[in-house]
Amino acid sequence: MEDYRKKYPGLRPSFYGAQAYDAAQLINSAVVAVGGDTSKKDAMKAEMEKANFKSVRGSYKYGNNHIPIQNFYLQDVVKDADGQLSLKTVATIVKDDQDRFHDKCPMK
């Protein structure tokens, strides 16, 4: 977080920002894996399914229906060291959650 705050003064990191960053990293990992040849659509899809990148949110993988398996957190709104309101993660309330419809998906 320190690197982020130094690079973007006045902005606070967020889970939404982390998800957007992960999306860009996912696409980049696939483009790099196919040597920049984005016409290799099947190879890019296969690489994206591998999710071979380092997420800022920890391990990243997909369920059988291509929805991310992820943690959910309990957070409180608190004042940080600068007196600004921010989210503080209190606990992990669900670990490695897979959406409730994954078992109904034909993509096994």
Model-derived segments and their meaning:
Residues 1-108:
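Extracytosolic ligand-binding ectodomains
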